């Protein structure tokens, strides 16, 4: 039986928490015993001495993790606009992208460049809003900004409470209203999903995986 591989790029404007998220993914999948830190120079994907010294990524690096029988190649790209060429070269190798945006600073210049590049490459993406616990965090404002850039509907998957506080919490959205919003968004952008919905193939929560799979493959 052949192995399944997915190449997932992590992209963001500098200082949005890109490498920190990568470290957490490696930790949660058991690749590293302790999550590294950019500030302390212990991040697994910051291999160059200049990266450890300056606390920024200057070239694309890759780390692999296993999850539920799937090999995930996490591709950590530089966030500084001076190294945008590294990001652009990595896109041809990606299956999906995670775009990280700070809940405090919001959409920044390089964020817009990244979103446009992903549109041109026709790459599916997940937006991860980071720094929810920082003072001034406003995820709804960030979603509104991103919606003006996106060519398809943006659907928040979680509800955040007490933003800007250490006691913040996030929970997955559920319920009929969310079910209807997901189905409507998919039908607007994916003819195959609309056809399946109209033929009663997709009507219930348990079929969301099928809806999303159709959307991503298309």
Where do the protein language model's features map onto the residues?
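P-loop NTPase catalytic nucleotide-binding module
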Residues: 1-16, 34-35, 103-218
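P-loop NTPase switch module centered on the Walker A-proximal segment
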Residues: 1-101, 105-107, 141, 148-152, ...
């Amino acid at each position: 039986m052949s192995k399944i591989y997915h190449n997932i790029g992590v992209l963001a404007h500098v200082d949005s928490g890109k490498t920190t998220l990568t470290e957490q993914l490696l930790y949660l999948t058991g690749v590293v015993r302790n999550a590294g830190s950019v500030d302390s120079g212990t991040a697994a994907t910051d291999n160059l001495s200049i990266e450890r010294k300056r606390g920024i990524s200057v070239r694309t690096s890759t780390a692999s993790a296993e999850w539920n029988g799937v090999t995930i190649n996490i591709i950590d790209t530089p966030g500084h606009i001076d190294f945008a060429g590294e990001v652009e070269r990595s896109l041809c190798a990606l299956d999906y992208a995670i775009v990280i945006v700070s809940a405090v600073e919001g959409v920044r210049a390089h964020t817009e460049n990244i979103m446009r590049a992903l549109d041109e490459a026709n790459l599916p993406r997940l937006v991860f809003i980071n720094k929810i616990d920082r003072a001034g965090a406003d995820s709804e404002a960030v979603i509104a900004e991103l919606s003006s850039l996106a060519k398809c509907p943006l659907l928040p998957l979680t509800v955040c409470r007490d933003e800007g506080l250490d006691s913040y919490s996030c929970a997955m959205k559920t319920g009929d209203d969310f079910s209807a919003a997901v189905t409507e968004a998919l039908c607007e952008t994916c003819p195959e999903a609309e056809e399946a919905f109209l033929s009663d193939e997709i009507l219930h929560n348990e079929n969301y995986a099928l809806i999303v799979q159709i959307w991503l493959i298309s």
